[in-house]
């Protein structure tokens, strides 16, 4: 089957890889000159299934009001003048209760755990290198309340069979030796030993090279104007004077998916702006070994080979990519507070990206009401964590195979009353 994938971020490229491996003729289209040059370029570097959790959580509405008056707040909201933003925020608020939180987190952890397994299998079969580490993730608590609240997340981890360690502050240095100097500032931590880290951009670029060698066609510097459709079928992608035709089309444009699908399929994917610093390592014994997640500031500090990536925060501000100095100061403050000898902060590279977020935090994956239009978007802050699993899942559904995990609750059907996703079926031209 001929498949066109719109988007060459980590989700688009992993989709291309798995579809190609399933025997399909795949073309990837992107406006950028190469893969992973937007949201996948400089994210926090975490592959953290156990910490897969929606921003829509109990207590967030009240916290959001408090954060409005804090200099280093993890979340900020500025109205962008669109009804879509207001509707999206209302839908998010409706997910901020315990029942929705547990349901959403459960399916996010399910997909993320599967995705990590897919990444391991891909690494074993291809030998792909991306400055990855398998040292786990350590979530740090600065208050007694945060430490106590961890029991709620532990219940979800236990249900999903995810191993964990709840550590008192005196034991944090056993996992991250450099924290010995600052343990007095912390109340404890939650460690997930099976989590991983890695450079998402490097991974995506190298996988794109492998995919191209395997037969995938990449059309870069190719802006997409619109999808062409008739009845319940997409019949082409208009790119300037060209119309690119295929048997199936996959939307993986991240935050730009919503606008591209306007009038075709309604999906609640909104840009969640985040920031990062990439810092050269100064003293190896003063830098993190793997990934740290600061629960107070919602900031991750991740170790690559000779670099430290500090990323986080969320701004609901529309398609604004301005680099704000106060956000840089927050990132610098957190990394200096936890790892004062770790990096040359003054040499850091400052970056921002737009994560494609749904109100419930879960991506939308699968077929739409158009029989040959598929979605793989809306992964929010977890695109790197969920990419391989999402790509394999999409490939299985599109190819008519039964996926390894349940997936009905990942469909756009949860936002489209009356639409029921079809079960896997053997499509004309699919290779199995």
UniProtKB/Swiss-Prot annotation:
It catalyses: a D-alpha-amino acid + A + H2O = a 2-oxocarboxylate + AH2 + NH4(+). The keyword Transport does not apply. SUPFAM superfamilies: FAD-linked reductases, C-terminal domain, FAD/NAD(P)-binding domain. Pathway: Amino-acid degradation; D-alanine degradation; NH(3) and pyruvate from D-alanine: step 1/1. GO terms for cellular component: cytoplasm; plasma membrane. GO terms for biological process: D-alanine catabolic process. Keywords: FAD, Flavoprotein, Oxidoreductase. GO terms for molecular function: D-amino-acid dehydrogenase activity. Its cofactor is FAD. InterPro entries: DadA, FAD-dep_OxRdtase, FAD/NAD-bd_sf. FAD binds at residues 3-17. Its EC number is 1.4.99.-. It is an enzyme of class 1 (oxidoreductase). NCBIfam families: PRK00711.1. Oxidative deamination of D-amino acids. Belongs to the DadA oxidoreductase family. HAMAP family: DadA. This is D-amino acid dehydrogenase. The lineage of its organism: Bacteria, Pseudomonadati, Pseudomonadota, Gammaproteobacteria, Enterobacterales. The gene is dadA.
């Amino acid at each position: 089957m001929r498949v066109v994938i719109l988007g060459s971020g980590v989700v688009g490229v992993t989709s291309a890889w798995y579809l190609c491996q399933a025997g399909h003729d795949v073309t990837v289209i992107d406006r950028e000159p190469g893969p992973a040059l937007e949201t996948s370029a400089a994210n926090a570097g975490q592959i953290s299934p156990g910490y897969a959790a929606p921003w829509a959580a109990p207590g967030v509405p009240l916290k959001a009001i408090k954060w409005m008056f804090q200099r280093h707040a993890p979340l900020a909201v500025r109205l962008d003048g669109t009804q879509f933003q207001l509707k999206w925020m209302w839908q998010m608020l409706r997910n901020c209760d315990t029942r929705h939180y547990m349901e959403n987190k459960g399916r996010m952890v399910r997909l993320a755990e599967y995705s990590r397994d897919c990444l391991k299998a891909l690494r074993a079969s291809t030998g792909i290198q991306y400055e990855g580490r398998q040292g786990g993730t350590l979530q740090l608590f600065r208050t007694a309340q945060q430490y106590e609240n961890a029991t709620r997340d532990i219940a979800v981890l236990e249900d999903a069979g995810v191993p964990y360690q709840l550590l008192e502050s005196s034991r944090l240095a056993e996992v991250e030796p450099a924290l010995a100097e600052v343990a007095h500032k912390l109340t404890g931590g939650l460690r997930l030993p099976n989590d991983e880290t890695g450079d998402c951009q490097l991974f995506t670029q190298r996988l794109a090279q492998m995919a191209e060698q395997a037969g995938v066609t990449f059309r870069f510097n190719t802006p997409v104007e619109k999808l062409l459709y008739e009845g319940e079928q997409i019949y082409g992608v208009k790119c300037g004077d060209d119309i690119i035709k295929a048997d199936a089309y996959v939307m993986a444009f991240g935050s730009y998916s919503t606008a591209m699908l306007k009038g075709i399929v309604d999906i609640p994917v909104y840009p969640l702006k985040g920031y990062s610093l990439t810092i050269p390592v100064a003293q190896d014994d003063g830098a993190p070994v793997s990934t740290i997640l600061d629960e107070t500031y919602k900031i991750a500090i991740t170790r690559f080979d000779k670099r430290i990536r500090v990323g986080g925060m969320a701004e609901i501000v529309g398609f604004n990519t301005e680099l704000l100095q106060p956000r840089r100061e927050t990132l610098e403050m957190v990394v200096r507070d936890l790892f004062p000898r770790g990096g040359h902060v003054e040499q850091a590279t400052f970056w921002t990206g737009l994560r494609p977020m749904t109100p419930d935090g879960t991506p939308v994956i699968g077929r739409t009401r158009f029989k040959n239009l598929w979605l793989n978007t809306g992964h929010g802050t977890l695109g790197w964590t969920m990419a391989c699993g999402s790509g394999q899942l999409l490939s299985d559904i599109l190819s008519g195979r039964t996926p390894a995990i349940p997936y009905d609750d990942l469909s756009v059907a949860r936002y489209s009353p009356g639409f029921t996703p079809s079960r896997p079926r053997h499509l004309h031209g699919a290779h199995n």
